[in-house]
């Protein structure tokens, strides 16, 4: 009976105050139980305590899917996605991989440098490591890199091609007077040759003009053949105007230095010949060293070993001695020499920039002058100073119309070697082909008909 009135009062109280009933129920729950509800399951807590957070796929996370990264790279659905977020992730991964590789390399180099410091000491370790290539040199600003490389290459080329030292060149530039020949008469005989050499040799030795000694002896004949107008006029005197020749002429200092170097080369190659003779030969050849050497070799080869000494091999030297009016006692040998060539007189009288005439009377017709037969008219001066092409002289035995009908050669009398071809064609036909085409050349004596 007593319970009945209490129940409706309790129910009425709950209906009247529902918020108070909820607060009373929450107050009756223990605190430990509330903590367990907020903490989560104990299985996940143990995994989080033992292991770190497992990495997740960033591409999947961009698209709202959570997937572990381990073994997932090949099977990711968005591995080829090209959206903005995935492209940014790929670029970030590339940069991170490059940074990791760089740090790994730097750590390896530092460890090797420490080992070398322990082995060789603190001061010598980095230097030896850099020399061995273990530690590459730090990249610096190459502001003067190209200039230094050009200077180094220029220095190496100077060391490679400077075969003649400066002191020897300056010493040999001043002509030494011989015993039987005073220096004053030599300067009077060739004033245009010896005086510029002496002046330039002195200035080169005092001022250190490196420009006159840099050029190599090997490339010097090419430069002389290209730049000097003497060689151009010797090949074709009609080609080019006077203004072109003036433009092609180098400065006097460079021309004098080139001439001095050419004279020094000739004096080194032929020490037995006198300097004045070599200067005359070089002037006659248009300052071409190659032609001068060929002339000296041809003329010295034409003379036997028992005929005369080295001082009497050149007729130009005898001309120089006659011009200086030296006594006959200065001659070293008394053996008879070759007669003076009329063409040799033109070496000093004519200019170096005008070609020598290739006519036969200018070169003499003595059969003992040259080893080649006079019926061909082949001599070194003629081949070297022809106004036309030099290759024509070696084709003249074949340049008749009967042997080469297809080539458009003009008749022989139009060439500068017309007398050469006429002499060859005037030979008896049986004489020319019975003993061979070059039989008279080998025997050095024309056959008797």
Curated annotation (Swiss-Prot):
Binding region for DNA: 57-104
What one GO molecular function would you report for this record?
Answer: metal ion binding
Recorded GO cellular component terms are:
nucleus
Q: Where is this region: Disordered?
A: 166-259
Q: Is the keyword Nucleus in the record?
A: yes
SMART domains per the record? DM
**Stretches with biased composition (Low complexity):** 230-240
* Keyword terms, alphabetized: DNA-binding, Metal-binding, Nucleus, Zinc
Where in or outside the cell it occurs: the entry states:
Nucleus
Predominant subcellular localization, coarse grouping: nucleus
Q: For the DMA domain, which residue ranges apply?
A: 260-295
Checking Pfam families in the record gives: DM, DMA, DMRT5_DMB
GO biological process terms, alphabetically, are:
germ cell development; sex differentiation
Highest taxon above the source species? Eukaryota
Biased segments, Polar residues type: 167-177
Functional note: May be involved in sexual development.
What family is this? Answer: Belongs to the DMRT family.
Listed name of the protein: Doublesex- and mab-3-related transcription factor A2
Task: Report the source organism.
Answer: Oreochromis niloticus
What does the organism's lineage look like at the top? Eukaryota, Metazoa, Chordata, Craniata, Vertebrata
User: Which gene is annotated as encoding this protein in its UniProt record?
Assistant: dmrta2
């Amino acid at each position: 009976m007593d319970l009945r009135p209490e129940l409706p009062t309790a129910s009425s109280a709950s209906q009247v105050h529902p918020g108070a009933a909820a607060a009373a129920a929450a107050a009756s729950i223990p605190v430990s139980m509330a903590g367990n509800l907020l903490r989560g399951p104990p299985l996940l807590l143990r995994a989080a305590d033992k292991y770190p957070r497992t990495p997740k796929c960033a591409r999947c996370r961009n698209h709202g899917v959570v997937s572990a990264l381990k073994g997932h790279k090949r099977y990711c659905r968005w591995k080829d996605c090209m959206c903005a977020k995935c492209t940014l992730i790929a670029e970030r991964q590339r940069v991170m991989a490059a940074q990791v590789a760089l740090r790994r390399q730097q750590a390896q180099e530092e460890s090797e440098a420490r080992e070398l410091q322990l082995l060789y000491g603190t001061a010598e370790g980095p230097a030896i490591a850099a020399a061995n290539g273990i530690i590459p040199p730090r990249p610096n600003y190459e502001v003067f890199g190209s200039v230094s490389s050009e200077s180094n290459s220029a220095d190496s080329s100077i060391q490679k091609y400077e075969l003649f030292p400066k002191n020897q060149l300056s010493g040999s530039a001043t002509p030494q007077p011989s015993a039987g020949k005073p220096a004053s008469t030599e300067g009077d005989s060739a004033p245009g040759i010896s005086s510029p050499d002496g002046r330039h040799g002195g200035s080169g030795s005092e001022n250190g003009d490196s420009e006159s000694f840099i050029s190599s002896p090997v490339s010097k004949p090419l430069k002389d053949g290209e730049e000097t107008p003497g060689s151009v006029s010797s090949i074709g005197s009609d080609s080019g105007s006077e203004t072109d020749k003036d433009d092609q002429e180098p400065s006097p200092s460079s021309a004098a230095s080139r001439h001095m170097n050419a004279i020094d080369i000739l004096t080194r190659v032929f020490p037995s010949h006198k300097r004045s003779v070599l200067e005359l030969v070089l002037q006659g050849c248009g300052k071409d060293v190659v032609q001068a050497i060929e002339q000296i070799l041809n003329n010295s080869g034409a003379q036997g070993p028992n005929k005369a000494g080295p001082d009497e091999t050149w007729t130009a030297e005898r001309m120089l001695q006659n011009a200086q009016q030296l006594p006959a006692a200065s001659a070293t040998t008394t053996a008879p020499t070759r007669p003076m060539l009329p063409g040799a007189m033109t070496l000093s009288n004519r200019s170096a920039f005008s070609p020598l005439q290739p006519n036969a009377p200018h070169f003499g017709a003595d059969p003992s002058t040259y080893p080649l037969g006079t019926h061909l008219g082949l001599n070194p001066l003629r081949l070297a100073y022809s106004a036309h092409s030099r290759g024509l002289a070696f084709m003249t035995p074949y340049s008749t119309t009967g042997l080469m009908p297809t080539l458009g050669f003009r008749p022989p009398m139009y060439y500068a070697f017309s007398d050469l071809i006429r002499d060859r064609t005037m030979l008896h036909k049986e004489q020319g082909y019975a003993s061979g085409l070059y039989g008279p050349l080998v025997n050095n004596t024309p056959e008797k008909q």
